Amino acid sequence: MHVLQLCYKPPYPPVDGGTLAMNSVTQGLMASGHKVKVLSVCSDKHPVRSDALETQYKDATGFEAVYIDLSIHPLDAAVSLLCGESYNVKRFVSKEFDERLTAILQIESFDVVHIESIFLAPYVATVRKHSDAKVVLRAHNVEHRIWRQIATATRNPLKRWYLKKLALALRAYELEHINDFDGIACITANDAETFRGEGCRKPLADIPFGVDIEPIDNVDAEPQTLFHIGSMDWRPNEEGIRWFLKEVWPLIHKEMPAVRLFLAGRKMPDDLMQMQSEGVVVVGEVPDAAYFIASKQINIVPLMAGSGIRVKIIEAMSLGKTVVTTSVGAAGIDYTDGKELLIADTPQQFVEQVRRCIDDPELCSSIGAAARRLILDKYSNEALTQRLVGFYNKLGAVAL
C-alpha cells in the first residue's frame, strides 16, 4: 500500500507528543511493508531540524516540507473573528503547500492520503481533484473541545471571551468538514463518540498511539524525585504546570521537603527557566527524553484541558514509571486507578498520591511495572498499525 502522510509540523525527529504520534504511524506502516511519502508543514515555531534529520529517514519517506507563516497576525485574527472563520485553520492555508501537494499527486499514485489533524482539512479538495486515494483524518484531539476547556479555565474576561469565540469557530469548521473525509481514525473511543454525536456520518475507528520503547538499562531512578516532560508550546501543558507550581508544589514541599521536582521540555518559557523555587529544577529541552524519564521516580501530569491521548504518559508508562495525573490527562488510556495510574484532580489529591509513592517505594515500583505491562499488552505499535491498515482496507483502499 502506498500512503501519503500530510503532517501539520515536521514529524521527525520525534521530540514531543504530536511528533511521536505521527512518527509512530510512519514507522509502523514502513515496518509492515508499506510505502510512505511524508509531506509536512514547517514554520518558525516548528522548523525542519536538518541537523537531526537522518538520511535514512529522509530517503525512506521522500520527506518534504513547505514553509507556512503560522505566526499570529492581529489584523487577520480580527477579520476571522468578525467573519466567523476559524483562524486556527485559516493560518494553515498556503498556496505554496497546495502547489507542492498538487505536484506530488500528479507524479505519484497513492492508495491512502493520511491527514494528520483537522488543521490540514483545507487540502482535502486538492486531494480529491488529483487523486482517487481514500482520504483519512487522523484526529489527534477534538480540537474545539480543548479550546473550550482552555477558555473556561481562563480568568481574564476579555481573553476568555475571545478564546470561546475561537472554540466556537473551530467547532463550526469541524462540524462542516468532518464528513469531507472517507474515514476518521481517532486516538480514543471518547473522541470517536464525540464526532459521531456531532454529526459525523463517515466510518470512525479508535486507534490509540503506539509505542515500541525498550527499557533503559543501567539507569537508577533518583529517589524522591518528581518530573514533568512535555512540549511547553502546547498550551494545556504550560497552563497545567503553572497551576501545579502555584497550587500544589508549595503543599508538597512543605510536607516533603526532601522531594525535588524536575521540569523538562521544549520551548520552556523564559520566566520558568529563570524561576528560583526551592526544590524545583528547570532543565528545559533534554537531548534524550527516554533517559531523562528513566532517571526520575514519579511522573506528574497536571493536565486540565485536552482530548485524545497523552503521548508522554504512554511513553513514561512504557518505561515503567508511576504516573500521577488528572482524569483529563488519563483520558483514553485503558487503566485502573491505583493499579497502572494514580489519579489526582485537586491539589490535596496530588499531595496524597505523591506521598503514597514516596512513603512506599515498593508500591511505586509495582504501579510502574503494571503500567509497563499494560502498554506492552495494548499499545504495541505493530498491533495498532495492523488496526490502522485494516481500517484503510475497510474504506476500500486497495494497493495499486
Region roles according to the model:
Residues 341-348, 356-362:
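Conserved acidic donor-binding segment of nucleotide-sugar-dependent glycosyltransferases
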Residues 8, 75-90, 135-172, 231:
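Acceptor-binding helix/loop patch of EC 2.4 sugar-transfer enzymes
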Residues 182, 291-308, 319-322:
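Acidic donor-binding loop of glycosyltransferase active sites
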Residues 312-316, 322-326:
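Short hydrophobic beta-strand element within catalytic cores of glycosyltransferases
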Residues 134, 164-167, 171-216:
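Donor nucleotide-sugar binding/catalytic pocket of nucleotide-sugar-dependent glycosyltransferases
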Residues 206-295:
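Conserved catalytic-core segment of nucleotide-activated headgroup transferases in glycan assembly
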Residues 363-378, 384-390:
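A short, well-ordered alpha-helix in the C-terminal region of glycosyltransferases
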Residues 1-64, 106-108:
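N-terminal subdomain of nucleotide-sugar transferases
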